[in-house]
């Protein structure tokens, strides 16, 4: 059984609130994450809420990367979905988590569009949690 795509659903906590509240910084991180994950960027849009929070999406040839942030809680909800075999969505997820300085991540990997013999599509979910070895004050490159 082959899969059509990989969808990473990520809960990130203990993130740097200053980064989560900065739409330009989040855009920069996401565009670089697309490169790191070997994705071809087609478009992007990021919106800064008042008084706080950012929502944004990068459309890539392989699908999309999106985020919704709650800086006051140090929390971000991420989606990274790719189709095909050239992209590396896990590298993009790791890059984003590092740059937003997440202390904790709960990641679900969903294999989307697994074709069964009777031409129905199912998906498989793999979930893991990580306590990340970084502190908000630490600068990692």
From Swiss-Prot:
It catalyses: S-adenosyl-L-methionine + H(+) = S-adenosyl 3-(methylsulfanyl)propylamine + CO2. The keyword Lyase applies. GO terms for cellular component: cytosol. Keywords: Autocatalytic cleavage, Decarboxylase, Lyase, Polyamine biosynthesis, Pyruvate, S-adenosyl-L-methionine, Schiff base, Spermidine biosynthesis, Zymogen. The record marks 62-63 as: Cleavage (non-hydrolytic). One of its GO terms (molecular function) is adenosylmethionine decarboxylase activity. Binds 1 pyruvoyl group covalently per subunit. Is synthesized initially as an inactive proenzyme. Formation of the active enzyme involves a self-maturation process in which the active site pyruvoyl group is generated from an internal serine residue via an autocatalytic post-translational modification. Two non-identical subunits are generated from the proenzyme in this reaction, and the pyruvate is formed at the N-terminus of the alpha chain, which is derived from the carboxyl end of the proenzyme. Pathway: Amine and polyamine biosynthesis; S-adenosylmethioninamine biosynthesis; S-adenosylmethioninamine from S-adenosyl-L-methionine: step 1/1. Its cofactor is pyruvate. GO terms for biological process: spermidine biosynthetic process. The modification Pyruvic acid (Ser) is found at residue 63. InterPro entries: AdoMetDC_C (IPR042286), AdoMetDC_fam_prok (IPR003826), AdoMetDC_N (IPR042284), S-AdoMet_deCO2ase_core (IPR016067), S-AdoMet_deCOase_pro-enz (IPR017716). The active site is at 63 (schiff-base intermediate with substrate), 68 (proton acceptor), 83 (proton donor). Its EC number is 4.1.1.50. Heterotetramer of two alpha and two beta chains arranged as a dimer of alpha/beta heterodimers. Catalyzes the decarboxylation of S-adenosylmethionine to S-adenosylmethioninamine (dcAdoMet), the propylamine donor required for the synthesis of the polyamines spermine and spermidine from the diamine putrescine. Belongs to the prokaryotic AdoMetDC family. Type 1 subfamily. This is S-adenosylmethionine decarboxylase proenzyme. It comes from Thermococcus onnurineus (strain NA1). The gene is speH.
